[in-house]
């Protein structure tokens, strides 16, 4: 029997479930923490097959956005994290007591980056099916701009148990400062990912940007030699440089969509 719930009720129930799962991960041993990134996917399975039960109908799967659509969104999904994170590490290499460790071969490093992007995208799929595949389309009752901003904050809060708990994700430096910078970074990056998903109508640009973000950060961190906590403050997922750049792109995207909406309203009058 299919349970009929509005998109608003479905989305709020999903958020409760996925946050509860994230908190529940604190009770599991370190060896099980790899499941953390799959809690959004597990929440989707609960919603689609046990609660709403739309997983037994084609329409439930269509809303996930598995079809390859869009064009420029894929290029943006690669370029934006490369520039934003690359700029952060470049500032850190030149401005603080650290050292860039040149790899034996930059060509091999580029190949590693491509491989990491592919693997990172596959790893991010568990999250993106939940956030951008399932939740975002059902979150549009808030409006496009409000939903993108709120979704970014929801996504950031989902990471908090991993940062504040014993797992000590992003553990260098002052934890509360790192948490603040990380929240801003995830909110802004989330807005960008949401916009690429909504503009393209496909989950895959979101998956690609998420995977590229993680891959670029991993590769650049591996060629950075430093034990200073300033690395967390300047570069990477909690760095102020990526926060500014991701923020600028996110604000530009939101303003652009607001202008398009106003133009469509004025043309319809």
Question: Where are the predicted features?
Answer:
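Membrane-helix interface linkers and caps
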Residues: 2, 34-77, 82, 89-105, ...
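Residue-level signature of the transmembrane alpha-helical core
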Residues: 19, 38, 78, 82, ...
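Short, hydrophobic transmembrane alpha-helix segments
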Residues: 24-36
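C-terminal membrane module of polytopic membrane proteins
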Residues: 211-269
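N-terminal membrane topogenic signal
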Residues: 1-16, 237-238
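Membrane-interface interhelical connector segments
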Residues: 163-176
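Membrane-interface helix/loop boundary segments of multi-pass membrane proteins
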Residues: 126-157, 198-202
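Functionally important transmembrane alpha-helices
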Residues: 173-235
